[in-house]
Structures are given as C-alpha cells and as structure tokens.
Amino acid sequence: VDSVITTARKHDLKIVFLWFGAWKNSMSCYAPLWVKENTKRFPRSLTENSKPLEICTAFSDNLLQADKRAFCELMKHIKAVDSQENTVIMMQVENEIGMLESARDHSPLAEKAYRQPVPASLLKALKLKKKGTWAEVFGTDRYADEKFQAYYYAKYVEQLASAGKAIYNIPMYV
C-alpha cells in the first residue's frame, strides 16, 4: 500500500484502491486462508441443491466482523499516511459481488433470513404496501431470489463501507 502511494505521488497520480475481503468476482478466492479453511466459523453459500460454493455467505456475522476489522485497519493506515496529501481519493468496497450457479444463497443462515418479513425500510423504498416474507412479497422465481440476495449483499457492504468511512471519510463505491 505504501509503495503504491509513494509511486503514485512521484508521478502525480491519484489512486482508487479496491478492497476485496470477502468477495471478488462472486467468489471468496482472495479471502485469507484462515477464513477459507474454517467453514464452521465462516460458512459457505449453498445452492438450492445444498451444493457448497466457494462463496462465503453474506449472512455470517463472523465474516462481516472479520472483514470490518481488516478493512478498518487498512483505512486507519491510509488515513495515517495519506490524509494530508490525498493521493488515495476513493475506495471500491468488494468487487463484482453476486452468486454463481444459484440466484441466491440457500445456506441455513440465508434460509432463516428468507423466512423473515421483508424489512420495512426496503418496502418503503420500493413503495410497496404488501407486507410478508420474501416469498409472500416477491414470489418464488429467480428474480425474487435475486432481489433477496441483492438486498443482503447491499446491507453487508453498506455496513463495511460505513465502518471504513467512520475512520477515513473518502468516497466509496461497489
């Protein structure tokens, strides 16, 4: 990180760093080995046929907390070395998140969330009057599954970005 910042300064360039802690191009292949090896602490997403995927579930608080800790340490460091010169102008939080092989996660944690009522804040944002579970409000097709998964990915990334911005308030995007 320091070398990239120093080199950018020498060439009068600005930087947008990319953080891919939990996911990159849908997969969790760049997660640290201690995350990938501990599937009990960091469960994987499952297809509708219970096939495990190399995608950490967005429904794991353990994953979110570990991702936050590491991301916040990075943001502290960037602030310490760059808040005066502002070489780092933006941060991309995660990269191309989504599901492959299945429209949504069917892990036990995801299934529990799927059976819960759709959050009121989402219903309000979508200007929907209907209340109920995800299946009751959106149906049970692939598009409904994608809405469910997109909401929870967005919720995860929003929490991660907010934690980072609380440390060093630079623009962030997905």
Give the role of each language-model region.
Residues T7-A22, Y153-E158, I170, V174:
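Aromatic-enriched hydrophobic runs in primary sequence
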Residues V4, A22, A70-L74:
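Alpha-helical scaffold elements adjacent to nucleotide-binding pockets in ATP/GTP-utilizing enzyme cores
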Residues A31, K36-V174:
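Polysaccharide-binding and catalytic clefts of secreted carbohydrate-active enzymes
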Residues G21-N25, E96-M99:
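Solvent-exposed loop/turn segments at secondary-structure junctions
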Residues V1-L18, K24-L33, E37, E48-I55:
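Active-site-adjacent substrate/metal-binding segments within catalytic domains
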